[in-house]
Structures are given as C-alpha cells and as structure tokens.
C-alpha cells in the first residue's frame, strides 16, 4: 500500500511539474541573446486570413524591446511549413542596447527570413475562429539601419 501511495505521489508531482512548464519557449541568438516564455495564438478575424502571433510573457534582461513575430497566414490553416514567401503581412523585431533595430518583415517587400512549421493545427472547440497549434517558428532578423552588422535569430517552440 505504501509503494502505491509513493508512486501516486510521484506521478502527481510529475504531472504538476509538467503543467508548470510553459508550452511556448523562445530564444534569441546572434547580436542579441536571451530566452523568453510566450503564448502563441492563431486566429481568424473574418477577413480571409488567419493571424499567427508569438506574444512574449515578459521582458528579457538587457533587451530594450522585442516582438518575436506576428504574421498573416493563408486559409485554410493546416499542418505544414510556411516561409516568408507563403505568409502574408507581418513583422518580427528586436531592439538591441545602443539603438540597433533588427527586423524581419513582409509588407510590399520582404526583409529577413521566416519559417513557420505547424506540426499540428486543429480548430479550438472552445473559441470560434481559433486554432490549437504546435510547432516551431524561426525568424532571421537583419539590421534595419545602415552601418549595422550581423543578425538576430528568433527561435520558438510551441
């Protein structure tokens, strides 16, 4: 009986620990470094495209500002790989100490690189127009101003 209670306690602790881990984790490397936890959403506001957003949960020490990424995703949403060529308008940006800004964007043109891999994408039964997604997001941000060198990689697992 005692061993059953110990096993039950160990399983309960493992489940509690697993739930405490954020489902979305990100990392910056290159000219700006750091790690962050985040939330990922993929919603369809009713205009013919979905919106993918990586929303950080807090600041990164020594990083003045960062927005890991928000891009439009073509419908229908499904598992697969999307690059900046496939995605709609959007932006990822990281500001470095000293004023340098690194971006990957798609507006009328493109800069930087973005790869979004959706391993799983299924409608969220609790929220109309939303999907539950799992996968990876990677963006290579390049300097926005003249005279700056290097790049920043944003890597997110969700």
Where are these regions (language model features)?
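Hydrophobic h-region of N-terminal signal peptides that target proteins for export
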Residues: 5-18
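A broad, structure-centric signal for solvent-exposed, well-ordered loop/edge residues
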Residues: 7-8, 35, 125
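An ectodomain-focused feature that recognizes extracytoplasmic/extracellular
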Residues: 20-113
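Acidic, glycine-rich flexible loop segments
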Residues: 86-158
């Amino acid at each position: 009986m005692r061993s059953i209670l110990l096993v039950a306690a160990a399983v309960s602790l493992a489940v509690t620990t697993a739930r405490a881990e954020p489902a979305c984790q990100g990392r910056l490397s290159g000219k700006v470094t750091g790690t962050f936890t985040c939330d990922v959403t993929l919603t369809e506001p009713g205009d013919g495209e979905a919106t993918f957003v990586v929303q950080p949960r807090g600041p990164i020490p020594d990083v003045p500002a960062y927005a890991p990424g928000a891009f439009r995703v073509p419908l229908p949403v499904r598992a697969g790989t999307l690059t900046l060529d496939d995605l709609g308008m959007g932006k990822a940006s990281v500001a470095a100490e000293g004023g340098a800004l690194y971006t990957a964007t798609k507006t009328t043109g493109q800069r930087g690189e973005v790869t979004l891999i959706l391993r799983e994408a299924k409608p969220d039964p609790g929220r109309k127009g939303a999907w539950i997604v799992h996968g990876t997001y990677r963006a290579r941000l390049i300097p926005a101003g003249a005279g700056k060198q290097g790049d920043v990689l944003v890597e997110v697992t969700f």
